[in-house]
């Protein structure tokens, strides 16, 4: 984009869509070096890539699935850096959407642990809702303990 032209919402959206598509293409690449470089740079892509990466986490190719998981963690940790409150909130909301019952347990479990690093007080209720889930209750309990504020501990 030219620095002299105003940036429109459509232009930003197109850039984000392209960045996500490029990231997913590289995560799925057959070359391990390409995949590694992709997941290492995923933090800059941010929240727009969360749901696409979660889908790739279930890929039949274990190395591709692992690269997608690493990319998601990179995004979470990048968003959790000091001074990135708005980015952290956006990523947390999108990671929270991965807790939905239509996702595989492995994806939901990983999302829980990601929220333990960037969890918002507003996300305690959905996490606490998983305390009744047979497959995820222990993870949900530990995540609430890890968040450790009064609201999360009261949810236990």
What positions do the PLM features span?
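Structural detector for internal amphipathic alpha-helices that build alpha-solenoid repeat scaffolds
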Residues: 2-15, 33-47, 52-55, 63-86, ...
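Repeat-mediated protein-protein interaction surfaces in helical alpha-solenoids
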Residues: 18-21, 91-95
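Mature N-terminal segment immediately following signal peptide/propeptide cleavage
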Residues: 25-31
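A conserved position within tetratricopeptide repeats
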Residues: 27, 57, 98-99, 131
């Amino acid at each position: 984009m030219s620095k002299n032209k105003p940036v429109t919402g459509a232009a930003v959206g197109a850039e984000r869509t392209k960045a996500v598509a490029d990231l997913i293409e590289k995560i799925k690449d057959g070359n391990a070096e390409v995949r590694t470089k992709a997941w290492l740079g995923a933090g800059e892509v941010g929240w727009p890539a969360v749901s696409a990466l979660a889908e790739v986490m279930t890929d039949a190719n274990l190395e591709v699935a692992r690269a997608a998981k690493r990319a998601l963690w990179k995004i979470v940790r990048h968003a959790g850096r000091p001074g990135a409150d708005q980015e952290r909130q956006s990523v947390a909301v999108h990671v929270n959407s991965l807790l939905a019952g239509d996702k595989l347990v492995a994806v939901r479990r990983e999302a829980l642990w990601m929220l333990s690093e960037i969890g918002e007080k507003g996300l305690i209720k959905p996490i606490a809702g998983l305390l009744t889930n047979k497959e995820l209750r222990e993870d949900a309990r530990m995540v609430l303990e890890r968040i450790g504020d009064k609201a999360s501990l009261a949810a236990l």
